[in-house]
Amino acid sequence: MVVGVFDKFSCELNNSKPHVLLVNPSDMGNMGTIIRSILGFGIKDLSIISPCADIFNPKTIRASMGAIFKIRFKIYNSFEEYSAEHGNHNMFPFMLDGHKTLSINDCPKTDLYTLIYGNEASGLPASYQEVGQSIFIPQTKDVDSLNLPISVGIGCFMFTSTNPIK
């Protein structure tokens, strides 16, 4: 058996780098997978709106495969609280009724952005249509939505490919 022991820690986000923002994520395994995925694409700043899954839960830590120790994260009480600190970012909420369809040939070009994703079960509230430019990931009619970690991975791939992190 292998056991890891560490102290819980807190971080401040880098305001001059891209962020991923999760709004009320509830699944600890998904959160760990997302942490690992964003780091894989070079995004090292994760913001989370509470209530949310426990970032220090063993399931989250295991799913992150150690990536949690290489990112910065901060938990906020509301989107307004996040926006007050990072309002200089271009905001891109990912929604099933997003106004812009994400495509390889037409991904928004910007160096400073926040990719916003909603809860696994309910997505983002309609009010996020008014936040920045809402994005839709195209998919077939055979499914009603994509899994949250898959959506985050697609968004991170597209944005970091179009806007390499410096």
Name each model feature, range by range.
Residues 86-91, 107-110, 150, 154:
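Short, surface-exposed amphipathic charged segments that create phosphate/polyanion-binding patches used
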Residues 1, 17, 112:
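Conserved catalytic motifs of the protein kinase core domain
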Residues 3-5, 20-21, 47, 115, ...:
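Conserved beta-strand segments that form the floor/walls of ligand-binding pockets within enzyme
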Residues 25-28, 62, 114, 119, ...:
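Short glycine- and Lys/Arg-enriched binding-loop motifs that mark or flank ligand-binding interfaces
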Residues 94-144:
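Active-site/ligand-binding-proximal alpha/beta "capping" segment
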Residues 4, 39-41, 55-69, 126-166:
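Structured adenosyl-cofactor binding patch, chiefly the S-adenosyl-L-methionine
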Residues 6, 10-98:
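RNA substrate-binding interface of SAM-dependent RNA methyltransferases
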